[in-house]
Amino acid sequence: MVRFAAVTPRPLIAPHTVVGEHTHVLADGRVRCDVCPRACTMREGQAGFCFVREARGGEVVMTSYGRASGFCVDPIEKKPLNHFYPGSSVLSFGTAGCNLGCRFCQNWDISKAREFDRLTDAAMPEDIAAAAARAGCKSVAFTYNDPVIWGEYATDTAHAAHERGLSTVAVTAG
């Protein structure tokens, strides 16, 4: 198991908002989000296709940090993994928004949610890791929508989980 050094969660620049990674400023003043292959270009105040990344102050910010759309303790066998802690439990969670638009998505109500106020506010990375440990889970799963759009949140949650000896898995579209 890979061990990470203790990491302080990244600073919030506004409620549930952190500066995004993988951003480029374009010559015309727009910013480009390079988190996923869509490479959304945005002007100030515009949101990308995923709806959780937007242009603010000349950079892309992630607006769903610490806001999860659901939690569930699942058997690990429910995930697309092979022989990963067989018989164990995993704490699954996701956020709102998605970089895809699949009409057959079983999580459409979550992945295309625009009502952030219905999402929980009590879901900071350390809280998630602590909840997984209390529930007896061996791992935490980033799922329900493509976690690439909330990579900063997933990364910080992974650090918190690993500090507690928990593994992490990402269920992605790719």
Which role does the model predict for each range below?
Residues 55-174:
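Conserved Radical SAM active-site core
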